[in-house]
């Protein structure tokens, strides 16, 4: 808690309320969660109240370390109430590790309400090691409100990832830009669902760009719904293997074909390299904190370790 930011533990359900006063500028909130016990299933409800005219950065994420045989799961439900002319940058990162047979599951839900003139930019990244994820995002925008979503996902092995975006452009001159970048390696499978509804004079754009490697599988299911004559909605999608000319360029610089493919995959999904030392919960703690150390300004942290 600071002079402008209050973090209050909920009394009726697990989670916290983050209350940011109107006019707050250049401050940040960090909310990392670490699960280190095999078989632990955790659900939290975190609500963010962003006052009128505030300009803040919120950093959240979860790391799971599972060396056992049971499934470890974290489901985080984050709801944002963004006031008039407020600006929020939300950064969310997920990471999993552990040599046990137990699965690592992360199911984030993000609900966003943006009032007149409000702005939110979301950067969501699934780094590695997550066996299964269903990522749901729902948003409604008032007059002049803007939502920008940048999703980055990498799956490998037999992992599965499903992302679902639903955006209601209710206000005059509201706008949304939903961009997904992903890499599917091994036998992994991904599904990208996007639904933008233009209910007023507005602009909506959704884009899926996926790289396939090995026997990866990606399915993109766009949906645009125009309910107003002045709604302008656009969808773009590109799914395929790495282009041969891209490989050749890197191989002429001395990389092997495998090294070139790996480099392109990292660039395509903007993969975060984690090189923390140590083991067990120490390693995953360092990893997720390192991955989340991207914001600037005065900050307040709520840290939750489940062990």
Features from the language model and the residues they span:
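Conserved beta-strand/loop scaffold segments within soluble protein domains that form the structured core
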Residues: 2-257, 266-269
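Short amphipathic alpha-helical segments at helix boundaries and their inter-helical linkers
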Residues: 131, 262-280
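Type III/flagellar secretion export determinants
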Residues: 250, 274-307
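Short, intrinsically disordered, charge-balanced linker/junction segments flanking boundaries
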Residues: 256-259, 263, 301, 305
């Amino acid at each position: 808690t600071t002079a402008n930011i209050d973090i209050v533990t909920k009394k009726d359900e697990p989670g916290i309320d983050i209350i940011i006063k109107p006019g707050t500028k250049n401050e940040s909130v960090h909310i990392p969660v670490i699960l280190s016990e095999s078989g632990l299933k955790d659900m939290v409800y975190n609500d963010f109240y962003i006052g009128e005219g505030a300009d803040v950065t919120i950093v959240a994420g979860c790391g799971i370390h599972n060396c056992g045989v049971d499934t470890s799961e974290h489901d985080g439900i984050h709801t944002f109430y963004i006031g008039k002319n407020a600006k929020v940058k939300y950064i969310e990162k997920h990471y999993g590790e552990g040599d046990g047979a137990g699965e690592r599951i992360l199911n984030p839900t993000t609900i966003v309400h943006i009032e007149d003139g409000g702005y939110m930019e979301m950067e969501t990244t699934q780094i590695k090691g997550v066996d299964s994820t269903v990522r749901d995002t729902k948003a409604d925008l008032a007059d002049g409100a803007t939502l920008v979503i940048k999703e980055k996902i990498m799956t490998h092995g037999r992992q599965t990832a499903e992302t679902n975006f639903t955006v209601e452009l209710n206000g005059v001159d509201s706008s949304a830009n939903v961009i997904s970048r992903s890499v599917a390696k091994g036998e992994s499978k991904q599904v990208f669902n996007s639904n933008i509804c233009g209910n007023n004079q507005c602009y909506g754009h959704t884009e899926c760009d996926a790289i396939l490697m090995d026997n990866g599988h990606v399915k993109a299911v766009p949906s645009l719904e125009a309910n107003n004559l002045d709604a302008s909605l656009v969808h773009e999608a590109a799914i395929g293997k790495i282009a041969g000319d891209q490989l050749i360029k890197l191989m002429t610089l001395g990389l092997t074909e495998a090294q070139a493919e790996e480099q392109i995959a990292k660039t395509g999904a903007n993969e975060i390299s984690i090189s923390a030392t140590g083991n067990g919960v120490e390693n995953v703690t360092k990893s997720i904190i390192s991955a989340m150390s991207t914001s600037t300004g005065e900050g307040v942290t709520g840290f939750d370790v489940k062990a």
